[in-house]
Amino acid sequence: MAEENHTMKNEFILTGFTDHPELKTLLFVVFFAIYLITVVGNISLVALIFTHRRLHTPMYIFLGNLALVDSCCACAITPKMLENFFSENKRISLYECAVQFYFLCTVETADCFLLAAMAYDRYVAICNPLQYHIMMSKKLCIQMTTGAFIAGNLHSMIHVGLVFRLVFCGSNHINHFYCDILPLYRLSCVDPYINELVLFIFSGSVQVFTIGSVLISYLYILLTIFKMKSKEGRAKAFSTCASHFLSVSLFYGSLFFMYVRPNLLEEGDKDIPAAILFTIVVPLLNPFIYSLRNREVISVLRKILMKK
């Protein structure tokens, strides 16, 4: 009996979205289609950038890594979610929870820094085009990309490590479609104040620094666009920036709501819509927002299709 109770403390049940059979089938089809489009779209973009020397520039190196991160995000969350739609055993161990959150936190943190790097790259290209190759060298690009993944790993290690200081002795039902860290805090029998404080400080710092970099870069870009004499060039540049900024706003807005709001352990029912945005919707939209509006990518795709 003691062993069974101990097991219960370290296993959780993901309640997911709904228990209605009709809705389960519909949601499964929708999320499976989104998953396929997300993975195929992002991996295709990575392959396209990797195999064509014409795209081996800082802008596309960042874009390729962003696509890789988005596909990893989908793979970390969606398979288990799809399995749970029809599985009677929706259990997940504490260690599986830790692994799932580790990968999610790593890729989302890397995503933040990559978006900041991409915004800086566009700032240099539009505001200082003559100095682009000096200010945005391949060496700096590689350093920024590597730094994004190192920061992601360190950030996730801190939070995952602190999870193991908690004790779970009450309910083991997680009202979520994946094992996020906030529901674990709510189930803890030990006061998670330290975990909550560390999450607020580190997540807040990452997001404030990266969104600040993005906003400053886009502010300078907009000022430069408004100074353009060509109305056509101004409209094209503004249209591209607007679509990029929409993706950034959805991503950062949902992350801020999830992890940087006051009283993190309250309002658990509102976590799921925000989580859907940054784990499912944004990875789906990014390859289309960043590539289908890009002349270089479209040009390479046309050449490939013409050869076939």
UniProtKB/Swiss-Prot annotation:
Residue positions the entry lists as glycosylated: 5
Extracellular topology ranges: 1-25, 76-99, 161-196, 259-271
Residue spans crossing the bilayer: 26-46, 55-75, 100-120, 140-160, 197-217, 238-258, 272-292
Taxonomy, superkingdom: Eukaryota
Molecular-function annotations in GO: G protein-coupled receptor activity; odorant binding; olfactory receptor activity
Assigned protein family: Belongs to the G-protein coupled receptor 1 family.
The protein's name in its UniProt record: Olfactory receptor 5K1
Lineage: Eukaryota, Metazoa, Chordata, Craniata, Vertebrata
